[in-house]
Amino acid sequence: MKEKVVLAYSGGLDTSVILKWLCEKGFDVIAYVANVGQKDDFVAIKEKALKTGASKVYVEDLRREFVTDYIFTALLGNAMYEGRYLLGTAIARPLIAKRQVEIAEKEGAQYVAHGATGKGNDQVRFELTYAALNPNLKVISPWKDPEFLAKFKGRTDLINYAMEKGIPIKVSKKRPYSEDENLMHISHEAGKLEDPAHIPDEDVFTWTVSPKDAPDEETLLEIHFENGIPVKVVNLKDGTEKTDPLELFEYLNEVGAKNGVGRLDMVENRFIGIKSRGVYETPGATILWIAHRDLEGITMDKEVMHLRDMLAPKFAELIYNGFWFSPEMEFLLAAFRKAQENVTGKVTVSIYKGNVMPVARYSPYSLYNPELSSMDVEGGFDATDSKGFINIHALRLKVHQLVKKGYQR
């Protein structure tokens, strides 16, 4: 009886070749296709997998779970890798791998396989998730397999093999970039972008219009949160209202994209130590992250916020490096959920030519006291108390300066 392997399958050249290669090695290959919002023809992908040799194909719609359990969870900690990247690819990988493990368990498969390269981050994200959720599963990673590497030294070898085996290859002109698309973002890498001094051509961008070409008209959105989670979006001009999590996020993507929001061009540090240039389009999440952070400004205690902000870079790093299912992540999420208990209210954002600016906010749990904050009203605050406050904090500075200058106390 053949051993079963569940292959994370995209329908592209690499995973199609891997599927056939695994079949030839004697495996019963079950193809698994994850719909996380990419614009693919899933019917055609399923048909291609079956023709290539898969015994069964799972096409799983994970979009809603992606939004509620992954994107919104990352939002609780304002996750941004190296201060800029909103982690669109990294956040999707643990979800994809989790469902792959579930299918393997359901099918009684002994193996899981993926087509991630040996230079990138995704191999780590997939395999750490496999290990965390079912350490008994064996992993086949062809791009780290000496036999596979000896047979396929590059794209030409893959194409020749596909033609030899009758695997359909798209004849349409391929974009000269390596791209990853899901509901949260689309990323563009490789090609001319490998030169960090190269200014991307406008045709790189497929989701967003250039801010220069965006409408010369402000869009006002009112975004509602409960315990840090987005629950409603209202367009204050045309009255459009979205409360379903998936529809809400798709609407923010739509509004952000047509207004040139969410473009990012950066060189980042991959987990394995290689620097990589990525160009990203993340319109909806950019709007959410900005609005959420603004609401925290009136609802979160100062020290709690500052502690959370100290932990946020580590949170983003854990997501980027593939440690979504880890004890340290459980610890951080428990703390973040506690910190978000009063992050409830609404924020109005002005969206205009690539910019997202909070212009109003309200919360029933607001810690903002107009009288205390006023320049004109005392509001129970005794200004003379500030003298002692300053003296206490100045004491160590005075001592440090005296010692520095060589004086004795």
From Swiss-Prot:
Binding positions for L-aspartate per the UniProt entry: T117, N121, D122
Molecular-function GO terms, alphabetical: argininosuccinate synthase activity; ATP binding
Cellular localisation: Cytoplasm
A Pfam family assignment: Arginosuc_synth
One GO BP: argininosuccinate metabolic process
Catalytic activity: L-citrulline + L-aspartate + ATP = 2-(N(omega)-L-arginino)succinate + AMP + diphosphate + H(+)
EC numbers on record: 6.3.4.5
Pathway: Amino-acid biosynthesis; L-arginine biosynthesis; L-arginine from L-ornithine and carbamoyl phosphate: step 2/3
Residue positions binding ATP: A8, Y9, S10, G11, G12, L13, D14, T15, S16, A34, G115
Subunit composition and interactions: Homotetramer.
Protein name per its UniProtKB record: Argininosuccinate synthase
Taxonomic source organism: Thermotoga maritima (strain ATCC 43589 / DSM 3109 / JCM 10099 / NBRC 100826 / MSB8)
The organism's taxonomic lineage, starting at the top: Bacteria, Thermotogati, Thermotogota, Thermotogae, Thermotogales
